[in-house]
């Protein structure tokens, strides 16, 4: 998993560890087990442990919304992107679009750096940079995701919920509920 040393540039290690968790979850691991494993393997400062936890759980919780952003910002739909790239972009987009205290430059630069040093992703570092900078421009312009026409799909995308759940919710509460 993580090949970074503890002397890696500031902020890179927590983001790498969160990315490792996302990849493990995509491969079938339970999020809490994957997170506990990466945190146990490193002696991190409490602030770094908190950042790893927030990035991993946040990106997992917001996966559908982050995929919708990738579909909007990228040339290739999220589902067709290489998984490692997709999860790295989720870490970057989560910081840019859903966290308030992370400097934009830190979110973009660390994601690009992680792509550069990752086997198989180095050539895609410009893609990471381009997608994240497009997200910044979109955010600064006040643009939001276009929502689908039907209410269950709107709720699912806006709140990163499964379709079956929002369909049941609308059936239970009605379209006006």
Label the model's feature ranges.
Residues 1-177:
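Class I Rossmann-like S-adenosyl-L-methionine
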